Amino acid sequence: MSKQEKSNVEDKSLDIETAAQVETAQESASGALEELSVEEQLERAKDTIKELEDSCDQFKDEALRAKAEMENIRKRAERDVSNARKFGIEKFAKELLPVIDSIEQALKHEVKLEEAIAMKEGIELTAKMLVDILKKNGVEELDPKGEKFDPNLHEAMAMIPNPEFEDNTIFDVFQKGYMLNGRIVRAAKVVIVKN
């Protein structure tokens, strides 16, 4: 007999053995089922159903948690985008404040010559335009003269006695403060009354 014929014979005998093993396993499984009473089968089915229901509940719980997590992430992202929009110009606003300060200092001086008076009016209009642009972009001016001192909004540069005012009243403003959408960009530098 050739090698190929031997191989074919061996394969056929293996197939017959495998088929016999499968048939034996099926018979023993069906025999085992027949041996179980209807009550036992029902009990096993109930146990299986209970396990499946528990798994289903667990998956529902995990799905709800994942949904809540996604909602929290979405809200956090919206808040971050909103803050980026609101406070994105904060650095720009801080850099403009010294310009406003310089213009305001220049406007405090008395001017007598007609040309200088016209120049002062031009500077006043420029300052007003600059302040209006800042207001349009959410930058608010803090000029707290006469208000109560608030360390969150004001920086005390000096204290003076003055019986006409209550303690912690802002008597004078060295430098105005500014807020951007409710956040302090620069605290107002003030003189407060301390009797």
Swiss-Prot record:
It comes from the Bacteria. GO terms for biological process: protein folding. One of its GO terms (molecular function) is unfolded protein binding. Keywords: Chaperone, Cytoplasm, Stress response. Its main location: cytoplasm. Participates actively in the response to hyperosmotic and heat shock by preventing the aggregation of stress-denatured proteins, in association with DnaK and GrpE. It is the nucleotide exchange factor for DnaK and may function as a thermosensor. Unfolded proteins bind initially to DnaJ; upon interaction with the DnaJ-bound protein, DnaK hydrolyzes its bound ATP, resulting in the formation of a stable complex. GrpE releases ADP from DnaK; ATP binding to DnaK triggers the release of the substrate protein, thus completing the reaction cycle. This is Protein GrpE. It comes from Francisella tularensis subsp. holarctica (strain LVS).
